[in-house]
A protein has these predicted regions:
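Conserved beta-alpha junction segments in alpha/beta enzyme cores
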Residues: 1-97, 101-138
Length: 140
């Protein structure tokens, strides 16, 4: 007896790069932390971007994976806007996921007045630009 096994083909691309924030950025992530600013870099943070598309056709889905814990709505909207303007990729074609590491700190723009918080907005701008660079490497 012959059993047909469903198979599919797709196009796949992946790129990754460093997104480590500056060592003295505001870092307090949870209540037990004993300091506000990061005192160094233990391990670098990474962004990974993935493209999934059918073997034929124009449909595309992009996955943006960031070594961060979470991102607020305002920060997410800013990221997706920069990505859309920089690549032409629609917001609806992007899924952003997080590794959920508490080592990255909480990069909320509302923390700008805290020690090292002045580095958050420039870091998030650089992060968005880095994601655009990575997406441009896999845009097929």
């Amino acid at each position: 007896m012959h059993v047909d096994t469903p198979q599919s083909c797709c196009r796949f691309a992946i790129a990754h790069g460093d997104i480590t924030p500056p060592a003295d950025i505001y870092h307090r992530m949870w209540g037990a932390a004993k300091h506000d600013r990061a005192t160094g870099i233990h391990q670098p943070l990474r962004a990974t971007v993935i493209l999934l598309a059918p073997a034929e056709g124009d449909e595309r889905q992009f996955i943006i994976a960031l070594d961060h814990c979470v991102m607020g709505r305002r920060e997410m909207d800013n990221l997706l806007e920069v990505v859309s303007k920089g690549t032409g990729i629609a917001h609806a074609d992007c899924i952003v996921v997080f590794s959920h590491t508490h080592a990255a700190g909480l990069m909320g723009l509302e923390r700008a007045d805290l020690p090292g918080g002045d580095l958050i907005a420039p870091y998030l701008e650089d992060l968005s630009k880095r994601v655009v660079e990575l997406l441009s490497l896999i845009h097929i």
